[in-house]
Amino acid sequence: MDPNTIIEALRGTMDPALREAAERQLNEAHKSLNFVSTLLQITMSEQLDLPVRQAGVIYLKNMITQYWPDRETAPGDISPYTIPEEDRHCIRENIVEAIIHSPELIRVQLTTCIHHIIKHDYPSRWTAIVDKIGFYLQSDNSACWLGILLCLYQLVKNYEYKKPEERSPLVAAMQHFLPVLKDRFIQLLSDQSDQSVLIQKQIFKIFYALVQYTLPLELINQQNLTEWIEILKTVVNRDVPNETLQVEEDDRPELPWWKCKKWALHILARLFERYGSPGNVSKEYNEFAEVFLKAFAVGVQQVLLKVLYQYKEKQYMAPRVLQQTLNYINQGVSHALTWKNLKPHIQGIIQDVIFPLMCYTDADEELWQEDPYEYIRMKFDVFEDFISPTTAAQTLLFTACSKRKEVLQKTMGFCYQILTEPNADPRKKDGALHMIGSLAEILLKKKIYKDQMEYMLQNHVFPLFSSELGYMRARACWVLHYFCEVKFKSDQNLQTALELTRRCLIDDREMPVKVEAAIALQVLISNQEKAKEYITPFIRPVMQALLHIIRETENDDLTNVIQKMICEYSEEVTPIAVEMTQHLAMTFNQVIQTGPDEEGSDDKAVTAMGILNTIDTLLSVVEDHKEITQQLEGICLQVIGTVLQQHVLEFYEEIFSLAHSLTCQQVSPQMWQLLPLVFEVFQQDGFDYFTDMMPLLHNYVTVDTDTLLSDTKYLEMIYSMCKKVLTGVAGEDAECHAAKLLEVIILQCKGRGIDQCIPLFVEAALERLTREVKTSELRTMCLQVAIAALYYNPHLLLNTLENLRFPNNVEPVTNHFITQWLNDVDCFLGLHDRKMCVLGLCALIDMEQIPQVLNQVSGQILPAFILLFNGLKRAYACHAEHENDSDDDDEAEDDDETEELGSDEDDIDEDGQEYLEILAKQAGEDGDDEDWEEDDAEETALEGYSTIIDDEDNPVDEYQIFKAIFQTIQNRNPVWYQALTHGLNEEQRKQLQDIATLADQRRAAHESKMIEKHGGYKFSAPVVPSSFNFGGPAPGMN
């Protein structure tokens, strides 16, 4: 492999005129022996210019991520390309050195490479990585340290989320490395250069990945933990060099000194929260938690109090450092030991740290003025909450006020003082209201406060709606949102709250205010009984305002708001549904114009999904208005067409849901034209979305069977999709859905002349059973296709089975099918599946010519019926119970005081501890799908796809059919009757008698229901005579 040829090709990829030819040349060469090794040599060559090396390392990374592991292939298949072992050996030998000596831009790509190599090769093929890491870690050449630590980090990252029992190779390696890392760190502490601090930060990142989800107690004992805690405290406590203050404030968090502090605090907060809180940890950490709390928690807290003091004194503090500090302090509130140390400081922390963090800031004002849309995005970004010091401050405030005495009272006194101060700074008022709103949940449960909250709103919040300051109007809406459950004594106050919020939504000139108003208005309507009526006359302008804001802001929270409003005002929305849907469709098209790589595209995707769900909600609201639904259909089809034709995979799920909603009542000619497009999408890139397509396909089959059967191409397309799923690699859930759809078609088309399809359907389902099946659900669902065919036409099924031949299966398919079915009869769950089994068995035993295999298993048949009917009895009872369940369980008003702790009490989360132990136990056990069953009376997941036999108005009653067939057999074929019944014991005979009695009761009840439905009288409960006797011999038998 000539390196120069590859170098020239790599150089060519950077020239637009040569790129296509260069890429073709590389793609032709990439499977050659030594190609990958040569790429690594090029990447490491300092003689080459950096862009060529970068192009080489990116190509190398793509090769390793795609082609490194060996691939398993089925016998007879061609093995896919993987990197030859000779090349892999060369890469393993050299990649560590490449990472150590490469510049940052190359190194970052190489660490991705080594991550993949470790994932597939350690420890089975590459134990030498541990020796290499050990060698360079112990080297006195500090220039090697950062690179080798990046290699070690990738080793640890590969085990970060694994169960404890799977981490033994890592633990064995870290037995050697952890002491070395600690010694290196102590050695580096005196060196405050940026290179030294970068290395320190990397050691912390390794330590964090090691302990984030599992604490390896065999590695970390009290002695070495003492040393690590001292290191961590030292880093948190040390001053950052003064010259860092010359750096722009926005750039400071990226400096190594602040990053190092951030990771130190990450570790401390994680150790305390996950492993160091007695009463809140799983039992294997109980001893560690006691040690941590008594030996370390207070000492660490002291250092962190100093951090908060520095912040109070207006010294710069990186946001993540402050956030993690507050997280640690928050954990300390729950424990008497740390609380005792914290208690004298808590009021100072609330007033001097939490309060300033909760006030509107200069940075907020700058963003509001320069980019109000970005301001909205930031305030509603859940990921921002995970890293925001303001959210951490809010959490600490809530914990302290809910768990410790006097804190709430003093905090409310502080807030009240600010609110009543005549010329208070508006930003301070904003902070005070922010604090009060954050405590709403506690305040509304406390007798002393909950009655005062209405007056607080009246006196301190309502006046802010006329403030000149946008952020104060937004805060007023926000407070109403958080106090939406307040019990208004005055209707006038409730009306004022609604009117002020409505006006903000419709008339305010500032978008962040409109957004807060939209959310506040919706929660008030949902939580205040009289609110809905008040807003009813304004519903059109309210909805128009909401649609406008969604288009302007593309904010996902608002799509949730509008969905809830549509459900609240379904009648009022119906006349404007078409206008709303047009608006939403235009907004959707606007949102999806963002390319996948553009900034904010993830947020936009979530918003787009919300818009599609909103359109779906509108469809459900107008489903009884046929003419409106028809108008909506055209708009929706344009949206559906856009997504499917442009292959925007991330919206397939919502699009198929929309199409399903459009076909629930009828299937229009336009919706039938959609089926070929759905089929085409399935063939191209929609294979993995079959379960999302299923409700739509089910509608095509059941809602408009006439059209389905009017053109063979429709059934061919649906069968082809099911067949592809059953023979492909879609997974067992999708395969269950495919088999279910075949069963639905067979049942729906009984008597409709699809005899030629039955052999194809049955073969597709039973062929799947010749390959490995992991779940009983798939096994029974495939059997059920054949059972449905038996119910459709017993002779046709048996002929089909006789003609079927599967490889490696000597036994006749008929025998195998019936044996398997009877053996698995206890695996059929829910109402439909058991009913189908009963109907199938009835069809089988009622045949004039009994198949030979049935004589061999005749003793199993009635016990199978009994098992199924017992299950059906439970399933019907459960179904009736669900029907009668009233949803309006009155929630007992929680008047309880939230329980506060004494200063010497710990907050022990007993439920949480038990939950952690259950999770730990489950993590250690492999779930066995084969044996696991949910309550067998519950509806199964696939029962939602109803069939013609599940129609309650015209039921096919399995009890009556069974009884009728059994009476027929008793009279027509005494020998067969005797074969079926001779092995029954007394208990089984009694159970069969009960089934017969229940059959008569169900017939009488159904007749009564029909007469009542048609205006007749209602039967009283009938007295049902026993119709035949299972106790005696069959007629004519001696």
Swiss-Prot record:
Broad class of where this protein is predominantly found: cytoplasm
Pfam families the UniProt entry points to: Cse1, IBN_N
Annotated GO CC locations: cytosol; membrane; nuclear envelope; nuclear pore; nucleoplasm
Start and end residues of each stretch annotated as Disordered: 881-910
Full protein name: Importin-7
Residue numbers bearing the Phosphothreonine modification: 898
Domain Importin N-terminal: 22-101
Subcellular location(s) of the protein: Cytoplasm; Nucleus
GO BP term (any one): protein import into nucleus
Signal sequence residues: none
Quaternary state and interactors: Forms a heterodimer with KPNB1. Interacts with histone H1. Interacts with H2A, H2B, H3 and H4 histones. Interacts with SNUPN and XPO1. Interacts with RPS7 and RPL5. Interacts with RPL23A (via BIB domain). Binds directly to nuclear pore complexes. Interacts with SMAD4 and NUP93; translocates SMAD4 to the nucleus through the NPC upon BMP7 stimulation resulting in activation of SMAD4 signaling. Interacts with phosphorylated SMAD2; the interaction facilitates translocation of SMAD2 to the nucleus. Interacts with SRP19.
Main function: Functions in nuclear protein import, either by acting as autonomous nuclear transport receptor or as an adapter-like protein in association with the importin-beta subunit KPNB1. Acting autonomously, is thought to serve itself as receptor for nuclear localization signals (NLS) and to promote translocation of import substrates through the nuclear pore complex (NPC) by an energy requiring, Ran-dependent mechanism.
Keyword flag Oxidoreductase: no
InterPro entries linked to this entry: ARM-like, ARM-type_fold, Importin-beta_N, XPO2_central
Keyword Cytoplasm among record annotations: yes
PROSITE patterns listed in its UniProt record: IMPORTIN_B_NT
Compositionally biased spans, kind Acidic residues: 884-910
A GO MF term: small GTPase binding
Family designation: Belongs to the importin beta family.
Keywords assigned by UniProt, alphabetized: Acetylation, Cytoplasm, Host-virus interaction, Nucleus, Phosphoprotein, Protein transport, Transport
Residues carrying N-acetylmethionine: 1
Top-level division of the source organism's lineage: Eukaryota
In-chain residues carrying the UniProt-annotated modification Phosphoserine: 886, 903, 1020
